[in-house]
């Protein structure tokens, strides 16, 4: 760390230590294997199992030791391969603007391609996301149908290729478009929200850019990112307009300044805080990593770093917003309430209510999709993902707003409601309910959904005990989702436990309220007569 992250000195020291650690762990695993053969014998019983029973555990001390060593070996091997000590690895980094929200965290503002060769960054190239591909976009794939009609785009552009909430699929789509236009295939895709990048600026406290006197605070950097301060700077190498102006110019200068700051070394007091920040933003899915190499993929899947939609055999919910270009989410807040009436041996009744509030001043005119003033309307294609057990879904029409481009061009189909049972791209089995929702300034819009869950969504445990489990997955880039989850037990049921600790238990209702900052699992264990 003192040499600077990804500097030549750091790379040399990291390579030496990782290589030595690999050797130590390999030796330890071999010795554990030999000890197991000695203790367990050919019959599979022996001293190890006796120790496990004596200590009251299901795993023997050798099992636990071997699992710990294997986990450590996997982590070391991940770093060894990721940093390019086996061969050079090329990655694409995406800066996603969470204010113009998209399923994986936000509109892609810029992309950086870099290669890690034995721990050293080489071949660093920064792209404006709007300049990776070019009209008439003949190399770009066809977009999904709802993107065609509501973004008014005949091709899936690089900057919009992250429209799948399953980040591994979005990463593959982004990498494919990038390869078609640049001829460069990458080994993985990393993404971070601009808010996370600003947090790093605030953490260091001494980052500077060419167009601002002195070090940047997080607040000042955010004003530049939002275009609230005029900026004139240097921009990325190869820019046609130098010096450059505006918030994109600031983004580029800030990127190179942060790279250089990391290379200069990380002071001891900052190291722990930086590691904690990275861990927290990965937990919140504001920092995502998906790698295509089979040697690297297992760890990011197991840790959840790759923002994958997780297939489950119980209840599931994910709410996703897709803001249209130029329309910022920061003016609109989203909350939702989910109520489930649990039953035994018959379908469960579920009610979901989405609520959007626009904090702008009420309008005296009709807002238009083509008007990019952020405070007028929130133009959003919402998606709700339900489990495969969801049936008999009731949803209201989602009429197109009179200011949409589709109506402006003379199309008469006015209902945008969409229901799809997915079969691929990481969403297999999930049911999607969505629509093109426009929230006018100063208004509140509610979307009610009602459906049934097949009895298989409830897990019987025997002796009259049942487990209801709900996985709620957070949308990357959205840290302010206010939720209510309420589970109503069957009549005469006895509550045996609930996790996490409920906000309240009232009669047959078990209720949680809070702000969704990460994926969350809610469980209710009960017994019936």
Language model regions located:
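Non-catalytic, solvent-exposed segments at the cell envelope interface
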Residues: 1-481, 485-487, 491-492
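Alpha-helical structural elements
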Residues: 86, 504-507
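Small-residue (G/S/T/A) turn/hinge positions that recur once per unit in extracellular repeat modules
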Residues: 120, 390, 498-504
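Surface-exposed interfaces of beta-sheet-rich extracellular modules
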Residues: 492-498
